[in-house]
Amino acid sequence: MTMASDPFSVLGLAADFDVDAREVEGAYLRRAAEAHPDVLGGDDEAAEALVGQLNEARAVLLDAERRANALLALRGGPAKEADKSLPTGFLMEMMQTREEIEDALRSKDAERIRSWRAWAESQRTGYVERVSRLFREGGSHNLVEVRRQLNAWRYVERLIEQMDAGAGCGAA
């Protein structure tokens, strides 16, 4: 991962999963001020490129799932393309869950959709907590488990996206 693709380095932050959003915003604003064309000697093209990198780094670090993927890559963990493993029984559970969510969306049952949304949010919170713990514990053996958790987490995010699209975002 190059500095340009390492969001932590781009913003000058320590490569850590547990970053504070205010810290990310502060680092972003400091670096954005440095990216002004006047500071860069009037080089508008360089300023524009740097602002693009800063915006992407900020977006990655403010999104827990994207931040975890970036940190996993930095630590040499498996890429999602190379490791599609999931927790035991997870895929069957997700197939059943997706079916029930689709049924709730088809029937426009606002209460069931709200209930499933709350379930998905609690699942997301659980993945954030597990991934955070695994990164804090360290060790290369945990990197494989981080990937497995991220693969499962992505399924939950897709369910949330499906509910948002199907319910017109009014189910939250």
Predicted regions and their residues:
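C-terminal accessory/regulatory regions appended to core domains
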Residues: 1-172
